[in-house]
């Protein structure tokens, strides 16, 4: 979650601490100014190089390429935008910084000139902070919000034709200063709205809700208001209208309002009020007039319609009233499901869209193309556009799936067809059609009724050998074709990715279909051969028959293939949530790895037992699994992670399928190394562990921490089943010795473990000796680098909380302690005088912080505040 959506944090209590906090952040902002200056100078240099290049190109070539000119122009505009953005950020930091410097006497030369000693300056600063404490806290805390707001660039005032996602093209701005809303109902005071409107008159975006006009008087009041707006002659970038299509007065008001608008670029018409069926017979002519007004608007560049499907025929009928010769329309989107419309109207609909001379983006929700003429008209339309988003729910049986995709740069294609329609030959023709689009950069395919064939174990092994041989020869100029493929069953899958690997410009590819071994093997080919692929996503359907283990799909080769990727980000997932695999590329040397495995996936264990990830470039890994069957699987998981030698961040969430039988019994697995294997990760800085623990596993964590001196953040979360009588002494002693430790988070909930009355006192003594006393010693004696201690425990006994508060109050260095919110509330309400005195002492020292306060150098824990977990 971005900073702008977070609750305002609160600084620690205590005037001296508040002063230190403000001064420390001031130094951070000063360093940011220098950073922005450097970045600004670099961008200026790049901008000058680009200008020089363009001038040389113009001098040397009288007939230079228009595309090159456009690319250079776009780059220059982007650089200029970034330079201006950095200027604004520098000015913002300077403005706040200079005010704080002046008010807090931070100018040493000025202090010497006025004869102020360091002690006098400190006293004056404390007095100022005490008098206006909230003011200076807010100055510091609001800086991140303002910088984030500036970094986002506000709303997009100009949209380029090259934008891929047509849905995003229609998004309304969220900048409160630049859009205004009108509500047409009986309670609206249009006089007040007009007064406010004329005072500002600088809105870029207009939102209108026409849903509650019940009487003619209300209609005429809104109509008079519409005609008054017409006199202002204002222009808008976006007009967003929400209308009730079940109300005739609202439909008429929509027409009158559209006629009152002189100039706007993007129009969204939708209906938040829906019903199962509409009867538009009485107002059909009115709807035709509305569509004629919309499509005849001379300034309109984008139209997004989300209207009832019953209005579709009136849209087609209105085409005879529309002259498109001078139309500026570039982007068109119809996001209503049209499965039940008259199929005879569809061919006229595509023919109507063909006539717009500047149309480049077409997005169409589910529509039946069951007539041959409709398919032919669709192909003619596809010849004109560069970006197409189509969902086809029916295709003529005689059509051979020969589409015209040659000119497309962006294609999102979904098929909702009967399995028998999409035959092997038709699928082959479709992929050959896509293959012809040499400039295609974005491709998304969804075959949600595609039925795959079963694959035998023998065939799997044979194809695995084929792919391995292919990978070994990938550096040759041409990859040899395999000769030993099994015949007909593998053809559709293998050819599928073979065709796509020839799309040399393809950067973003996503596919959703039924998975077979052939599809996985051909996926390997695609990843090996595609030189420009930057993003790949596979969502597959997988159903294993328990009685037929020979249908098992082997995932072994995919990890080996992905290990060799240098540029591509990969996402592989199952719709049922069985597996989700992500490898995110930041640049050529930084990757982020995320793997989620759930218990229904039978081959999860092979991921850890048979393969090591060995991603040499991976620096951040998050692995979540609820499918591990034994402690050996956890050990294998640790081994796989330890093979990523450059890891800096690790987040592990590992649970077992059947943990109940080992809850109260020792695991007794001395031969397993568990987390001790992390000793190999010499660059590891941040660790988060959430898995079942026994003393052996807990000791393995301590052993690897002893060898890894770069650890900055250590997070140990509670697993829902805990072992009794664990000793945390060694763990806290090891953490105490880490020289760069900045953050510790402990969530073990020991108080929730219950014992019989006979053993209660023994258990209480053990908790004090093996957990609370080592924790308090750690708090007292930790290194100066430790900033935050997160103690997330719902309930703590009075004796234990006293020891913790005493430790943080008497600690050798200044640390911050954050308690569980419920625990904090109970402490405030406590009638124990000793606890209240300790709380007061901690407040004066400024060591207790609220749950939602954010420390810039600390990682999110996901417990108190909703930060983006992808920071791991």
From Swiss-Prot:
Where, subcellularly, is it found?
Answer: Nucleus; Chromosome, Telomere
What does the record give as the organism's lineage?
Eukaryota, Sar, Alveolata, Ciliophora, Intramacronucleata
Q: Which UniProt keywords apply?
A: Chromosome, DNA-binding, Nucleotidyltransferase, Nucleus, RNA-directed DNA polymerase, Telomere, Transferase
Enzyme Commission code(s) on record: 2.7.7.49
Assigned GO CC terms: chromosome, telomeric region; nucleus
Q: How does it assemble?
A: Telomerase consist of two subunit, p80 and p95 that form a 1:1:1 complex with the 159 nt telomerase RNA.
Q: What is this protein called?
A: Telomerase component p95
Reaction it catalyzes: DNA(n) + a 2'-deoxyribonucleoside 5'-triphosphate = DNA(n+1) + diphosphate
**What ranges does the record give for the region Disordered, renumbered to this chain?**
55-75, 471-492
Show the GO MF annotations. Answer: DNA binding; RNA-directed DNA polymerase activity
Basic and acidic residues compositional bias, start-end:
474-486
Q: What does this protein's UniProt record list under function?
A: Ribonucleoprotein DNA polymerase that catalyzes the de novo synthesis of telomeric simple sequence repeats. Subunit p95 contains some or all of the template-independent primer DNA-binding site termed the anchor site.
UniProt enzyme class = transferase
């Amino acid at each position: 979650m971005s900073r702008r959506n977070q609750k305002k944090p609160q600084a620690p209590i205590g005037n001296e601490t508040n002063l230190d906090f403000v001064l420390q952040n001031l130094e951070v902002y000063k360093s940011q100014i220098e950073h922005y200056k450097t970045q600004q100078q670099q961008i200026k240099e790049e901008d000058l190089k680009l200008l020089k290049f363009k001038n040389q190109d113009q001098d040397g070539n009288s007939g230079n390429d228009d595309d090159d000119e456009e690319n250079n122009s776009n780059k220059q505009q982007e650089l200029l935008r970034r330079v201006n953005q950095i200027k604004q950020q520098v000015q913002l930091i300077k403005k706040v910084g200079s005010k704080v410097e002046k008010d807090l006497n931070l100018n040493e030369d000025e202090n010497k000139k006025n004869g102020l000693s360091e002690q006098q300056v400190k006293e004056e600063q404390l007095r100022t902070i005490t008098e206006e404490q909230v003011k200076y806290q807010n100055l510091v805390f609001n800086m991140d919000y303002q910088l984030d707001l500036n970094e986002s660039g506000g709303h997009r005032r100009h949209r380029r034709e090259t934008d891929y996602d047509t849905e995003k093209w229609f998004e309304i701005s969220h900048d409160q200063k630049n859009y205004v809303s009108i509500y047409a109902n009986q309670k609206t005071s249009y006089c007040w709205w007009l007064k406010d409107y004329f005072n500002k008159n600088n809105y870029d975006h207009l939102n209108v809700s026409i849903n509650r006009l019940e009487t003619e008087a209300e209609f005429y009041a809104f109509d008079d208001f519409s005609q008054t707006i017409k006199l202002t002659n204002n222009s808008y970038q976006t007009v967003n209208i929400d209308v009730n299509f079940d109300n005739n007065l609202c439909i008429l008001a929509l027409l009158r309002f559209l006629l009152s608008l002189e100039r706007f670029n993007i129009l969204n018409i939708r209906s938040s009020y829906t019903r199962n069926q509409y009867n538009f017979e009485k107002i059909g002519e009115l709807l035709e007039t509305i569509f004629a007004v919309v499509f005849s608007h001379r300034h309109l560049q984008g139209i997004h319609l989300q209207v009832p499907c019953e209005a579709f025929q009136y849209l087609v009928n209105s085409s005879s009233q529309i002259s498109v010769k001078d139309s500026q329309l570039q982007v068109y989107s119809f996001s209503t499901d049209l499965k039940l419309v008259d199929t005879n109207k569809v061919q006229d609909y595509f023919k109507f869209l063909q006539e717009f001379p500047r149309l480049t983006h077409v997005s169409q929700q589910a529509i039946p193309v069951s007539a041959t003429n409709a398919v032919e008209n669709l192909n003619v339309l596809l010849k004109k556009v560069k970006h197409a988003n189509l969902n086809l729910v029916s295709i003529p049986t005689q059509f051979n799936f020969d589409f015209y995709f040659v000119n497309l740069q962006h294609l999102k294609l979904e098929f909702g067809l009967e399995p028998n329609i999409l035959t092997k030959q038709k699928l082959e023709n479709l992929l050959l059609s896509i293959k012809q689009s040499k400039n295609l950069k974005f491709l998304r395919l969804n075959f949600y009724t595609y039925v795959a064939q079963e694959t035998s174990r023998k065939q799997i092994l044979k194809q695995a050998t084929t792919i391995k041989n292919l990978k070994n020869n990938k550096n040759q100029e041409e990859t040899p074709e395999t000769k030993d493929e099994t015949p007909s069953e593998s053809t559709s899958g293998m050819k599928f990715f073979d065709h796509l690997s020839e799309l040399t410009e393809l950067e973003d590819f996503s596919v959703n279909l039924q998975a077979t071994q052939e599809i996985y093997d051909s996926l390997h080919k695609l990843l090996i051969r595609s030189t420009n692929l930057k993003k790949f996503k596979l969502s597959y359907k997988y159903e294993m028959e328990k009685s037929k283990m020979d249908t098992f799909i082997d995932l072994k080769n995919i990890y080996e293939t992905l290990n060799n990727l240098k540029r591509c980000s990969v996402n592989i997932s199952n719709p049922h949530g069985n597996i989700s695999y992500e490898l995110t590329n930041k640049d050529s040397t930084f990757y982020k790895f995320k793997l989620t495995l759930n218990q229904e996936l039978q081959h999860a264990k092979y991921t850890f037992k048979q393969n090591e990830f060995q991603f040499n470039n991976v620096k951040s890994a998050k692995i979540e699994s609820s499918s591990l069957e034994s402690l050996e699987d956890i050990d294998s998981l640790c081994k796989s992670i330890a093979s990523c030698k450059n890891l800096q961040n690790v987040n592990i969430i590992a649970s077992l399928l059947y943990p109940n039988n080992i809850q109260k019994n020792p695991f007794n697995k001395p031969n397993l190394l568990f987390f001790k294997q992390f000793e190999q990760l010499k660059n590891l800085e941040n660790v988060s562990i959430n898995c079942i623990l026994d003393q052996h596993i807990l000791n393995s964590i301590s052993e690897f921490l002893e060898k890894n001196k770069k650890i900055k953040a250590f997070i140990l979360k509670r697993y829902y089943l805990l072992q009794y009588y664990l000793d945390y002494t060694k763990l806290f002693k090891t953490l105490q010795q880490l020289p760069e430790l900045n953050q510790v988070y402990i969530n073990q909930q020991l108080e929730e473990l219950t014992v019989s009355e006979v053993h209660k006192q023994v258990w209480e003594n053990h908790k004090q000796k093996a957990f609370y006393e080592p924790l308090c010693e750690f708090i007292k004696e930790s290194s100066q680098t430790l900033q935050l201690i997160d103690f997330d425990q719902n309930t703590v006994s009075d004796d234990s909380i006293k020891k913790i508060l005493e430790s943080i109050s008497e600690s050798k260095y200044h640390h911050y302690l954050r308690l569980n919110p419920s625990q904090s509330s109970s402490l405030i309400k406590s009638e124990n005088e000793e606890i209240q005195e300790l709380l007061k002492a901690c407040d004066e020292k400024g060591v207790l912080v609220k749950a939602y306060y954010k420390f810039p150098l600390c990682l999110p824990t996901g417990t108190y505040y909703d930060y983006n977990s992808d920071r791991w």
